């Protein structure tokens, strides 16, 4: 199922039954519609809340299609396919036609992000401590390098594109990399199972969901210090910024 939440009332207002579409995971919103993955079916779908209908489905052909993002203009969709060890770039080729290009990367790609200039996609391998860089325009792997994580979960760029943040639940760390040099700047101990990463548009702080400790760690991105913790419900993970 997919739940629709009223953010003002802070309650669920609708629950969409996906039927035979199993294990939904990644979510992304574009032009008022919700794009989602279903890992078991190897597909991405689109839900229109105005009509309460799933109005589009597309197979990726890749095992365990997990996370999803769209380009700013909606002309491309990106997915991480964990068991397939690939990143898919899905480009619109006509009014209703899409071309799926799947690029082999490190083992177990899960967290990924697109650089602020839209030119590259970086994906973290959850099973081998790798980061893979992809040239989006040419749909090719640039390089893969190792960041020595135990299990990378999420990867995020700061808005200026200078820093790369990677959460490592098994080590309890947040890794901060310099994008240009690919060198470690700091590894911050956050607690039990840090996972989701949220960086607001001003880039001043990072919010990291510490799943096992039921809180969100707040990191100052100038000093790289842990400056606050926000208590949450049980097992926080994914987060979103509401404008």
Where are these regions (language model features)?
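Predominantly soluble domains enriched in secretory-pathway, periplasmic, or organellar proteins
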Residues: 1-243
């Amino acid at each position: 199922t997919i739940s629709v939440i009223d953010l003002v009332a802070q309650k669920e207002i609708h629950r969409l039954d996906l039927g035979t579409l199993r294990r939904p995971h990644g979510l992304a919103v574009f032009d008022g519609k919700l794009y989602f993955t279903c890992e078991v079916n190897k597909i991405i779908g689109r839900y229109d809340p105005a009509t309460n209908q799933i109005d589009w489905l597309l197979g990726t052909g890749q095992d365990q299609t997990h996370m999803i993002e769209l380009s700013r203009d909606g002309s491309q969709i990106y997915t991480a396919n964990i068991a397939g060890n690939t990143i898919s770039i899905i480009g619109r080729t006509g009014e209703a036609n899409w071309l799926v290009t799947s690029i082999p990367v490190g083992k177990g790609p899960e967290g990924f992000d697109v650089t602020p200039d839209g030119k590259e996609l970086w994906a973290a391998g959850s099973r081998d401590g790798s980061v893979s860089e992809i040239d989006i325009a040419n749909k090719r792997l640039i390089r893969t390098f190792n960041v020595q994580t135990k299990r990378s979960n999420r990867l995020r760029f700061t808005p200026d594109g200078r820093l790369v943040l990677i959460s490592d639940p098994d080590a309890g760390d947040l890794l901060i990399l310099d994008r240009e040099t690919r060198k470690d700047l700091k590894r911050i101990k956050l607690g039990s199972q840090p996972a989701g990463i949220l960086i607001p548009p001003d880039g001043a702080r990072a919010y990291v969901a510490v799943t096992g400790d039921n809180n969100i760690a707040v990191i100052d991105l100038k000093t790289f210090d842990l400056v606050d913790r926000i208590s949450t419900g049980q097992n926080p993970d994914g987060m979103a910024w509401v404008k």
